[in-house]
Amino acid sequence: MEDELYLENIDEFVTDQNRIVTYKWLSYTLGVHVNQAKQMLYDYVERKRKENSGAQLHVTYLVAGNLIQNGHTCHKVAVVREDKLEAMKSKLATVTSVHVYSIQKALLKDSGPLYNTDYDIIKANLHNCSKFSAIRCADAVPRTPAEVAQARTLARSSSQTPSDTSAVSTPPLNGHGPTAAKQSSQPPKGIMGMFAAKAASKAQDANKEPKAKEAPSVSAASSKPSAKGNIMNNFFGKAAMNKLKVNSVPGQPKEEKEAVKTSVPATEPESSPNTIVEKPGRKTEPAKIQQKDKKSKMKRMDKSDNEEEREPENQKKKRKRIKQLESDSSDEEDVLASPTLEEEKAPSPPPLVPALKAELEPASTEASAGGKKRKRKRVLKSKMFVDEEEGCMVTEKVYESESCTDSEDDFAKTKPPAVPKQPALPVKKEPKEERKNQKKGAATASRANKQISIMGFCQKK
């Protein structure tokens, strides 16, 4: 009677509930031994197939046996479907056991559903997972409640003993235990304080360096507009040039002082307690740098004085040049009493005002990689161009700026003064009025000849 009830239960699980019934799941559900559950599944399959040969039942089998691989014998346990059972048996050298593992209506593609079924039922009976197992161990005897309590007390005592030994190993000093703890805690704070101080000093140095870089850039930016503004005032006399140079020269020592200040703190964080002996040698380096800066300042002051002496002469020459141009234009107006259309269309000579402005700009100095400074000098050069309408060559003297180094300038100073040209001698000795009269006469003669030839050509036509 009991066997029939069990078979009815299995039929209900498989057909009605459409479950996957494994021997483990059936053992825990019905509370029977695993071997009995396997026998029940086998009987259900045989009985069902005898009653109805067309019944849709898919069975999986648990096969175990010895397998020979590469000359070595191994024991293999596999879960296979019914259609692959004979193939698996043929692979095994000896078959030790064949059991029904599960019964289900659907055809399984893999072993995932079988694993999930067994996992869920074992999780539900985790404390009695080996209750219906066929594997037994004689030494695996459950403990009595007294033995369990005794084991817990031993575990507690073993956990307290390390704390007691640590307390005994730290005796009080002069009857005051807490002071020892405070003293032990102080050194880490000191070490952390040292690291914090180093980090703070590095952060301050990092902040100082950008400020030092910004300061020279701001001063340079402020000096450029002032220089541009003062260039236009150079036409009104020597006083404006002197003010510009006085403003530009003191600005340089400030920048150099800031550079020295930034270089000294940059070297300080690199020094460590292990390199205390090297500090005196490092202190002498800023002193040497200051001496070099002083020497460079003196050289700059001397050069600025020499430039001040040269520039008044250049200004006089410039003013003379402007006056000469004005006088030439007035002579042309006197000679040309009846201008023609062709003469009105003739292009005027290129203006010299931009060239004069370029001449009045202060000589810019650039420091090269080798330490030499480059200057820009003004040189008087003659330029020739062809006047297309008049068909003649015209020469003009224009000041051009050339770059040279300090060494080239010093070499030029040491050379003996070149012999001045013959036309330059009467310029210095003769008074200004005689020079003007001579130039006016020469200009009028040349212009008159040109105009007469052009007028004669027009009259012939």
From Swiss-Prot:
Main location: cytoplasm
Start and end residues of each stretch annotated as Disordered: 148-229, 249-380, 399-461
Entry GO terms, CC: cytoplasm; delta DNA polymerase complex; nucleoplasm
GO biological process: DNA biosynthetic process; DNA repair; DNA replication
InterPro entries, A to Z: POLD3, POLD3_sf
Disulfide bridges in this chain: none
Motif stretch (PIP-box): 451-458
Subcellular locations according to the entry: Cytoplasm; Nucleus
Compositionally biased spans, kind Polar residues: 155-172
Entry keyword Protein transport: no
Biased composition (Basic residues): 371-380
Role played: Accessory component of both the DNA polymerase delta complex and the DNA polymerase zeta complex. As a component of the trimeric and tetrameric DNA polymerase delta complexes (Pol-delta3 and Pol-delta4, respectively), plays a role in high fidelity genome replication, including in lagging strand synthesis, and repair. Required for optimal Pol-delta activity. Stabilizes the Pol-delta complex and plays a major role in Pol-delta stimulation by PCNA. Pol-delta3 and Pol-delta4 are characterized by the absence or the presence of POLD4. They exhibit differences in catalytic activity.
Swiss-Prot/TrEMBL domain comment: The PIP-box mediates the interaction with PCNA.
Protein name (database record): DNA polymerase delta subunit 3
Lineage: Eukaryota, Metazoa, Chordata, Craniata, Vertebrata
